[in-house]
Amino acid sequence: MTKYKKKPVVIDAWQFTKENYKKGVPHWIKRSNRKVDLWSQYGGDVIGGEIKTLEGNYTVSENDYIIKGVKGEIYPCKPDVFEMTYEKVME
């Protein structure tokens, strides 16, 4: 089996938490060419969402990261996978 490693690319990401949702969804998510539907219920006690892509619909759960890929694609990523794959970039 041939092994590969991920190329070092810089992405935009935002963690979907109650606190972050109350502060506001980033413009790059709002303006994406994909349908991103994020919502809250019961006064903000429950949050969730869905991202519609060409490959299908993805559920967004609390604490998931929403990522903008290298080609502008928007998709969710579970926190454990995100933290194993990405590290914060100092600007």
Regions found by a protein language model. Give the residues of each.
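N-terminal domain-onset segments
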Residues: 1-54
